[in-house]
Design a protein with these regions (language model features):
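Core alpha/beta nucleotide-donor-binding catalytic domains of modification enzymes
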Residues: 1-157
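ATP/NTP-dependent adenylation/nucleotidyl-transfer catalytic domains that generate, transfer
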Residues: 147-207
Length: 207
């Protein structure tokens, strides 16, 4: 299969963000990979549109990734989200009352976006890179408990791992898979019921 790398500079972390971009460029040159890159002032965009920085960053990032996908002629956008990311997202959805869909977690394929690393914990990916002599960048903002996700990552999940279940991230994601099957079944039942009740004039609520 063909690969094209894409890097988006959110202009949030100053010099550290520029170092990340330079790292990606060097990596792509080393491995002869095509790179498309772009940067945008996420804080300014967030302020102009009354969005949280996290929401603004996601919007601009995925808008860019879709443009990059089309420009490069690629079929899909592959992100590096892993099992630990998924567990955090599931817990965030749980505490926000997102319902069944949110508790299902990230899907391996959602439209043109794929998540090929969802089966791997972060520590497994780091170990793989170290064993193969590959360098990597670390986002220092991940270690500051100033967001809900960072609070989960730095304090809540470690407490659960230490006091209840050291494999809690895997358990959370395994439960999400089971809930995903439940959701598929319920959606199928609902669709069948709708088709059975559908009439030329609308829906027969007695069926």
């Amino acid at each position: 299969f063909r690969l094209c790398c894409a890097h988006f500079n959110h202009c949030i972390r100053g010099e550290a963000a520029r170092e990340d971009e330079n790292f990606v460029r060097a990596f792509c040159e080393k491995h002869a990979l095509k790179l498309l890159s772009e940067k945008a002032d996420v804080p300014a965009y967030a302020n102009e549109n009354s969005l949280s920085t996290e929401t603004a960053a996601r919007q601009l990032r995925y808008d860019f990734l879709e443009r990059a996908r089309i420009q490069s002629g690629m079929g899909f956008i592959a992100t590096a989200h892993h099992l630990s990311d998924n567990a955090e997202s599931i817990l965030l959805h749980f505490f926000r009352g997102s319902g069944l869909n949110g508790l299902c977690g990230m899907k391996y394929c959602s439209g043109k976006i794929i998540h090929p690393l969802l089966e791997f914990e972060k520590k497994e990916l780091v170990e793989y890179l170290l064993q193969n002599g590959e360098q990597f960048q670390t986002d220092e903002t991940n270690f500051v408990p100033d967001t809900a996700r960072n609070l989960l990552r730095l304090k809540i999940i470690p407490e659960i791992q230490n006091g209840i279940n050291s494999s809690c991230e895997k358990v959370i994601c395994r439960n999400a898979k089971l809930l995903n099957e439940d959701e598929k079944y319920l959606n199928g039942v609902a669709k069948e019921a709708y088709l059975n009740a559908k009439t030329e004039n609308g829906v027969d609520t007695e069926k």
